[in-house]
Design a protein with these regions (language model features):
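N-terminal secretory signal peptides that target proteins for export/translocation
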Residues: 1-13
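Bacterial N-terminal signal peptides
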Residues: 16-27
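N-terminal, post-signal-peptide metal-ligating segments of extracellular/periplasmic oxidoreductases
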Residues: 31-178, 183-190, 198-200, 279, ...
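Low-complexity, Pro/Ser/Thr- and charge-rich linker/hinge segments at domain boundaries
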Residues: 43, 240-260, 505-523, 527
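Short, flexible loop/turn segments at beta-strand junctions in immunoglobulin-like
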Residues: 107, 205-208, 445
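Short Pro-Gly-centered flexible turn/kink motifs
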Residues: 114-116, 190-202, 433-443
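Histidine- and aromatic-rich segments of cupredoxin/plastocyanin-like copper-binding domains
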Residues: 150-187, 268-271, 284-523
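A conserved hydrophobic secondary-structure block that centers on an alpha-helix together
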Residues: 190-227
Length: 560
């Protein structure tokens, strides 16, 4: 059997030991300064994950910016300092705290309970840099209130009660840092209840919740963009990839040791001087982070071949067109908090990449480009926004292209024996990830001519990149190289012959016993208003979301 093929049964013990060793190296070895490390993981214990999470400012040690004048510096981001919750107090022990700009992963299982005390220690802001012209709720934005939202989880948006003072996934609460002053009353656009300094959350994960990847971030109307853009975001996993992704060779769950989590964030660092914000111009200091981001910070494409964009692009001057002068500034693009890291793919069966766009406003147009051929490498699509891809075997290519739309460039997979797969594999060469989106893909080296899984040469490599994206008449996002990928897959393949077999764990949500059919235990029907009557059996109510007043373009109404 050739290297790179499936192993024979008699070699199972040796190859399993090698795979175990590779998995231990992947999961536990310390990464070098330029190797991509996994996000720090906080796992539930005995069905509970109980954390203290402190939102605060911190210099980003993994990013160095050299201003036009002055010494190199680490720009200041906002991070979640996290530890397992101590018995008392709102501070983390110094030897137990994690405060990574790149983000952490909260690893949960179905049926778990997530408990978080969220403490606000964020700095006060300059109102001129956060206010929005047409936002009537901006009076308290400069005080930098925050809260927490577990994006994508199917959980209760529960408010506190007399018996239970904790919040569920409830976005209508504002947590203020008392050091920034007391919030003023608002007569219009009151966000919800106010809490000072901290709030306690208890989020119950249903036992029938689908496995997948989700994320958490602030959800304060009017300032969540600023807070996410400055770094406040992390990821959540429920269950394992192996719950819905199996190897096709022997129907074996894909090994969790070969699952890689990539959190994509970006940071605009200004050279100093006047900057155009929503409410008008304001001066910024050299090295200050622009968290009300400007899509025109740098040119969409390099000026010429001499401009190397490895993890960043240089600021440009658009003041002649009414923009800002960002010359000398830099727009950083990070993977797990690092700019242009190295990714070493060592498992012969390849890796599953779980990608999260944790940027505040940036949309990514992603490709994995073979460095030798300069052509995109085929990757298999596994999951989109926490929903595993499970298409019927008879799905046509035309249907898949239509389903992919402008988000995925769907291409034919290399020839596959249908008997090995429960669903139709979907292959892509390009994918657009808008803010908050998550995508899971199967990555392995492939023959450049056929696209089939193959054993790489000694120097096989690829570039994980943003190809540049134009949003119609809207924003233009730049082309930047995000990471260098090296393929070192020279052993026997244990699980994969042609691709991953996707079982579609998310389909169970639609079944009679699924989570979307479950009733909230304490919920009861609200009294009918005058003129309303119950719907007849089999009927559905349609609710229109849109503008309540078409003459006022600053108003957005829900439920009209």
């Amino acid at each position: 059997m050739l290297v790179g093929g499936l192993h024979k049964p008699m070699t199972r013990i040796l190859t399993s030991a090698a795979a175990l060793l590779a998995g231990l190296i992947f999961a536990g070895a310390a990464a070098s300064a330029h190797d991509l490390a996994e996000p720090t993981v906080f796992r539930s214990r005995h069905g509970v994950l109980d954390l203290l999470m402190i939102a605060r400012a911190k210099p980003i040690s993994t990013i160095t910016y050299a201003p036009p004048t002055g010494s190199p510096m680490n720009p200041t981001g906002w991070v979640y300092e996290i530890c397992r919750r101590p018995a008392s107090g709102n501070t983390c022990p110094a030897d137990a705290a994690v405060a990574d700009y790149g983000g952490v992963r909260l690893a949960l299982q179905k049926g778990d309970t997530l408990k978080i005390r969220l403490v606000n220690q964020l700095p006060q802001l300059d109102a001129a840099k956060v206010n929005h012209n047409a936002d009537p709720g901006q009076a308290n934005l400069f005080r930098n209130p925050t809260n927490l939202h577990t994006h994508g989880l199917i959980v209760e948006p529960r408010a506190p009660t007399l018996k239970d003072q904790t919040f569920g996934d409830y976005v209508f609460v504002q947590i203020f840092n008392s050091a920034n002053g007391m919030p003023v009353p608002q007569t219009t656009h009151q966000h919800g209840s106010n809490k000072m300094d901290y709030a306690d959350y208890r989020i119950d994960i249903p036992w029938n919740h689908p496995s997948g990847q989700f994320w958490f971030h602030p959800h304060i109307h009017g300032i969540s963009l600023n807070q996410v853009s400055q770094g406040l975001a992390g990821i959540i996993s429920v269950g394992e990839v192996s719950d819905y992704a199996h190897g096709d060779a022997r129907d074996t769950p894909f090994p969790d040791a070969s699952v890689r989590h990539l959190i994509l964030k970006d940071l605009q660092v200004a050279p100093g001087g006047p900057v155009q914000f929503d409410s008008g111009p304001a001066n910024v200091q050299p090295g200050e982070v622009i968290n009300q981001q400007d899509p025109g910070f740098c040119a969409q494409f390099p000026a010429d071949s001499s401009e190397v964009r490895e993890g960043s692009c240089p600021g440009v001057d658009t003041s002649a067109d009414g923009g800002s002068n960002f010359s000398g500034g830099k727009w950083f693009f990070t993977v797990n908090g690092r700019t242009f890291p190295k990714i070493k793919v060592t498992d012969s069966d390849g890796e599953v990449w779980r990608l999260t766009n944790a940027s505040g406003s940036l949309s990514y147009n992603l490709q994995l480009t073979d460095d030798e051929t300069q052509k995109p490498i085929i990757i298999q699509l596994i999951s989109v926004d926490g929903v595993s891809v499970n298409l019927p075997q008879d799905t046509t290519m035309d249907t898949m292209v239509r389903l992919g739309g402008a988000r995925f460039r769907v291409v034919p997979c290399p020839p596959l024996p249908t008997s090995r797969f429960h669903s139709k594999p979907v292959c892509v060469t390009q994918m657009v990830m808008m803010p908050s989106s998550r995508t899971e893909v199967f990555v392995t080296y492939r023959d450049p001519a056929t696209g089939a899984i193959a054993s790489p040469g000694r120097s096989a490599s690829a570039t994980f990149k943003m190809a540049g994206l134009t949003m119609g008449s809207g924003d233009q996002w730049p082309a930047v190289d995000l990471a260098k990928v090296h393929f070192h897959q020279h052993g026997w393949r244990n699980h994969i012959a042609y691709g991953l077999d996707i079982r579609g764990d998310a389909l169970a949500t639609m079944q009679p016993s699924g989570i979307l059919d479950a009733k909230v235990p304490y919920a009861s029907a609200a009294p009918l208003r005058d003129g309303c009557r119950p719907l007849p059996p089999g009927h559905r109510r349609r609710i229109f979301f849109g503008l309540a007043d078409l003459t006022d373009d600053g108003t957005f109404g829900l439920g009209y």
